[in-house]
Amino acid sequence: MFAGLPSLSHEQQQKAVERIHELMAQGMSSGQAIALVAEELRATHTGEQIVARFEDEDEDQDEDEDD
């Protein structure tokens, strides 16, 4: 799967991590916190985008089991 992701500086990445930790400290699950911060970043980011490829490890394991 390919996805367009915001290209973030180290400082922006650090702020995102801190925001995730704040949300988790308030009782939000890690998955929800990550999703919310990702949504916020996509909505407000005006810089460059990078393309990333994600591979589903489960699919690879399923294929290995079929052999």
UniProtKB/Swiss-Prot annotation:
Pfam families attached to this UniProt entry: UPF0181 (PF03701)
Disulfide bonds, paired cysteine numbers: none
Coiled-coil residues: none
Ranges of biased composition (kind: Acidic residues): 55-67
Domain of life: Bacteria
InterPro entries associated with the record: UPF0181
Region described as Disordered: spans on this chain: 48-67
Similarity-based family: Belongs to the UPF0181 family.
HAMAP family documented for this protein: UPF0181
This protein's name: UPF0181 protein KPK_1966
Organism of derivation: Klebsiella pneumoniae (strain 342)
High-level lineage: Bacteria, Pseudomonadati, Pseudomonadota, Gammaproteobacteria, Enterobacterales
